[in-house]
């Protein structure tokens, strides 16, 4: 009986088991990437310092194991982003919605990255972060400023978020998980 259950369990896992998804989380420095990563992983706000290099964590949500690579966003290390492109299934691009002075810079970095051949099939989730701040641009304004509507050949979604409260983060993962299931047989 136990052996039958074990075989059934393996079959069940094969049919309905966890899917895995490799996510690259990038954005300009101080956008909130590391805060988002650890809010998703631990459910709490951690004290962060500027990321030199990367942080990587596994986040399980809705039967999907997301491996999230949080890569530093300072201008001097952005050229290193390309070393993380291979096998990336989804990009989370984090924007500081309150930083109107650098939204053009964010757009340029996003467009540069989306032109890379290795990322042509990657899903794009934009987190319009820091929505709790009074002068934050809303998701529609960020969509316009980043030129997202012109992305015809790519699945993309924008989600208003607040990393410190967690608002919007799991809604973004919902979209990623739905899109991943559409792509999977």
Curated annotation (Swiss-Prot):
UniProt xrefs under InterPro entries: Arf1-5-like, P-loop_NTPase, Small_GTP-bd, Small_GTPase_ARF, Small_GTPase_ARF/SAR
The cross-references to SMART domains, in alphabetical order and at most eight, read:
ARF, RAB, SAR
Q: Which GO terms describe its molecular function?
A: GTP binding; GTPase activity
Its GO CC terms? Answer: cytoplasm; Golgi apparatus; plasma membrane
Location within or outside the cell: Golgi apparatus
Report the leader peptide range: none
User: PROSITE patterns per the record?
Assistant: ARF
Keywords attached to this Swiss-Prot or TrEMBL record, sorted alphabetically, are: ER-Golgi transport, Golgi apparatus, GTP-binding, Lipoprotein, Myristate, Nucleotide-binding, Protein transport, Transport
Q: Which CDD domains match?
A: Arf1_5_like
- GO BP field: intracellular protein transport; vesicle-mediated transport
Entry's family note: Belongs to the small GTPase superfamily. Arf family.
State its role.
Answer: GTP-binding protein involved in protein trafficking; may modulate vesicle budding and uncoating within the Golgi apparatus.
What name has this protein been given in UniProt? ADP-ribosylation factor
